[in-house]
Amino acid sequence: MAHKKGGGSTKNGRDSNPKYLGIKASGGSSVSAGSIIVRQRGTVFKPGNNAGIGKDHTIFALVDGNVHFRNTRNDKKLIDILPS
């Protein structure tokens, strides 16, 4: 007969690695070309003037300047870079 209890099993005990999403440069802050402004899943924010979008929906600056957030009439959030 066994003198130790069985090990048992569980379906818990896993967690995914952090993805560090969110806004990396706030409105009014100065950025250089290529700087990441927002890391996101899906297009919560869309690129405006002088901003680009990566394949993972990351918004980045195309020129040196200041970050400007704006809303359109149909509730879209755009990010512009105002050249300095």
Swiss-Prot record:
Gene Ontology BP annotations: translation
Taxonomy, superkingdom: Bacteria
GO molecular function: structural constituent of ribosome
Family annotation (InterPro entries): Ribosomal_bL27, Ribosomal_bL27_CS
Region Disordered, annotated ranges: 1-29
Keyword Glycoprotein: no
Keyword Ribosomal protein: yes
Keywords linked to the UniProt accession: Ribonucleoprotein, Ribosomal protein
An example Gene Ontology CC term for this record: ribosome
Family: Belongs to the bacterial ribosomal protein bL27 family.
Protein name: Large ribosomal subunit protein bL27
Species the sequence originates in: Chlorobium phaeobacteroides (strain BS1)
Gene behind this protein: rpmA
